[in-house]
């Protein structure tokens, strides 16, 4: 990557005086009509079928188009606006479906009995069978995205408001799309502007996250929470009275602009009518009715208290706006990221690096791949954390009792997190190859890490072997003992126990904090400081379990160690791809070959699965396998030990009658009692409203199996086949101008892994949906 030098004789100006170049690149739409315009070789057009694959591979590889960091930065920045435009169009579509094709009002009136639907299938050749009865006289496809619950939490009470949001989102899409064009063609930021790290941190922390969170707090306090308080009162059977009028239905709720009337909203939350003077006089307790610290969940909706959520966003806004002011930018005061990072020394005992983190700031501020790798790893991990909070601390009303939606959101956030973490490894590998200068990084933490890579990878390897042999060994033992009829010799809760004592201890610690004054500022005991999944009680909403304690036993410990094994192997593959991206014993010149390189050319025998790209390719399979185990475990565990109906005597009838603890301790149990038994709904879905999932189940299997054709067979076989066919065509003078050529091994693997993941995800989607929607 090269950095453009300033023009000769040009005096450097402060970036604040001239942060952009005007009319940088004229918008030339004719250029976009030429495929491959960004590459001299691709612009010549195809002479073989490899051209189309290279076109796809390089279209967004901005580094290789010009090789100039400033131009690359501008393209990425402009593409961000395009991405935002697509997001707004997608949001507009969701709002529009809610406004025109949904039963949102019907669901809002009776969320415990009416199911969410925002799509109606047109009757072309019998597809209308998929429009099942979701309650209250509405027929459509049941949706499991959680948007109804989210809209309810936002305070949306009608389809009219949804249509207004759909229109607003389209307007925003147009604005940001224009912004992307403007900031590339009309006012393109300079490289120095992109590299003002402290200013960027201020903009993100104060502007985007701080003020964004504060603005959302304002919406929650003034619109969403009063609306939700009225809806909760209706659902609880005790409607509130405002100005002498009983608020009996959602249609009676005042419109958002009417809720700005202090006298009106003060009847819901008196603190809102007390005035802003209490803030400046530090009488903050006057606001304690709409900024609460209740803990636990609202017993009416089974969701976090909306007033707790508002308090949470206000606290984050304060933290972020304060934190965003500690960096040094225009005024020469505050923290310098370069100084902070440069002053950090390595661990003198475990990881001696005489130069510590020196050079790390320059690496991160010159390599967008390195920054992206860090961001993807953090956001991916955050997505996985969100997945676990969706069921343990449900944020939206009536989400916890919509079991298909909870499972769908858990699965979605787990997969998104896994893909992002694999993306982090990919971009870390690219950063190491394209942006890492070995002459600059001498005896700093990066250099020491690369020098210690053999020790790091070998230790990870030993950990993986230990976990793999022992965790699978427990399963092999149990399957063997069960086959021999020796249940007393099995590892189980009723024989040889392997209790997860540490996890149980942590659960008891959290449970013991309920009713204590463990949160700063509270004088009374918290009724539910933590989630009820930690040894709490049963929270029932509409006769269904919203939350209850999740018991842990031998089966959980065994599966936990299977998770540990698969996650460590994924980490091993991805990390090895990064640490050995520049060189290895087999291929010492990898840095010159690039992130991906073919392994089927002259002199390249035996070099497959050596490039950094190949490690991402393999890591994706292990990521998929490890997360499949996670989501299968979650699905079965919740159906067996948590989800179900609450009987009049307080007992719970679970969906699958608690068979998890005894069946999940053998491989055969997983096959028989989970995969086979729970696939009955999808296998018998034909002729019902779930028939679409039956077809998706078959189609997903087909796409998955199709991937194996690319993954199992060698390139040489296909090339020989092609050449035989081409020879026959030449004989008949029918040879095509564009020469057919077999996919390279890298291209074949890319096609293979894409279909493997897509087919597997669709199959799992159909399996989960048909199962829980079929159970009703």
Swiss-Prot record:
GO biological process per UniProt: photosynthesis
Residue positions binding phylloquinone: 718
Provenance organism: Prochlorococcus marinus (strain MIT 9303)
Protein's name according to its UniProt entry: Photosystem I P700 chlorophyll a apoprotein A1
Cofactor note: PSI electron transfer chain: 5 divinyl chlorophyll a, 1 divinyl chlorophyll a', 2 phylloquinones and 3 4Fe-4S clusters. PSI core antenna: 90 divinyl chlorophyll a, 22 carotenoids, 3 phospholipids and 1 galactolipid. P700 is a divinyl chlorophyll a/divinyl chlorophyll a' dimer, A0 is one or more divinyl chlorophyll a, A1 is one or both phylloquinones and FX is a shared 4Fe-4S iron-sulfur center.
Catalysed reactions, as listed in the record: reduced [plastocyanin] + hnu + oxidized [2Fe-2S]-[ferredoxin] = oxidized [plastocyanin] + reduced [2Fe-2S]-[ferredoxin]
Compartments, as annotated in UniProt: Cellular thylakoid membrane
Family: Belongs to the PsaA/PsaB family.
Pfam families: PsaA_PsaB
Oxidoreductase as UniProt keyword: yes
Keywords for this protein: 4Fe-4S, Chlorophyll, Chromophore, Electron transport, Iron, Iron-sulfur, Magnesium, Membrane, Metal-binding, Oxidoreductase, Photosynthesis, Photosystem I, Thylakoid, Transmembrane, Transmembrane helix, Transport
